[in-house]
């Protein structure tokens, strides 16, 4: 999921990321359920040939419905479920804070549930996503898309923003860039000059 997302030439990297990260979580959670509750715990009681869904695994492992980690997974799962029918490039700006938190949550739970340190497999600096610097512009979305699609994008963004205001890094990791002008070169992180 991380490798796919960080390739700039791939068009549907947001949708691809959601598919692969959900698959990784599903396998990890089912493995944990087998380890902690036995093999039968990942099968439906009325259909022992069929394994439970990711939604079921999430609710069995993370029982607190208000847990920011669970809310994070549920939002990414919603994206995975609609991304085959509803793809927009603006979703990157909406979901990337959730994706980054999801990666760190996955790393934490792999260690807690399976004693596997993902930073031994993937160097820690590669657990960071390459993100677009472009901000989501509501007026641009309304102008670009039909009303139904624009409303959907802005509604999803509003719901995620509302949950993000709780400032819990298990739900989302806010990515902000601030630029300040200073005359003190020791405080500067980059330099600009006026060229005539």
Language-model segments: what does each one mean?
Residues 127-196:
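Long, charge-rich C-terminal accessory regions
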Residues 22, 26, 74, 81, ...:
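Generic structural signal for well-ordered, non-transmembrane alpha-helical segments
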Residues 3-6, 29-34, 81, 85-89, ...:
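Charged/polar positions within long, soluble alpha-helices
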Residues 1-17, 43, 126, 131:
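Charged alpha-helical initiation segments
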Residues 95-146:
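Amphipathic, Lys/Arg-enriched alpha-helical patches that create a basic surface
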Residues 2, 14-34:
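Short, hydrophobic, well-ordered secondary-structure elements
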């Amino acid at each position: 999921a991380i490798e796919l997302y960080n390739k700039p030439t791939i068009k549907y990297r947001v949708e691809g990321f959601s598919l692969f990260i959900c698959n990784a979580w599903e396998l990890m959670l089912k493995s944990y359920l087998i380890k902690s509750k036995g093999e039968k715990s990942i099968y439906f009681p009325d259909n022992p040939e069929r394994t439970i869904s990711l939604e079921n695994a999430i609710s069995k492992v993370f029982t607190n419905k208000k847990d920011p980690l669970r809310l994070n997974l549920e939002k990414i799962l919603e994206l995975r479920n609609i991304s085959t029918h509803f793809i927009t490039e603006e979703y990157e700006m909406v979901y990337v804070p959730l994706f980054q938190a999801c990666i760190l949550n996955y790393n934490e739970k792999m260690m807690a549930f399976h004693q596997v340190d993902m930073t031994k497999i993937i160097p820690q600096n590669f657990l960071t996503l390459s993100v677009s610097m472009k901000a989501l512009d509501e007026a641009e979305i309304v102008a670009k898309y039909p009303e139904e699609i624009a409303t959907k994008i802005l509604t999803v963004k509003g719901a995620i923003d509302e949950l993000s205001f709780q400032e819990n890094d298990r739900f989302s990791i806010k990515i902000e860039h601030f630029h300040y002008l200073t005359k003190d070169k020791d405080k500067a992180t980059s330099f600009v000059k006026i060229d005539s």
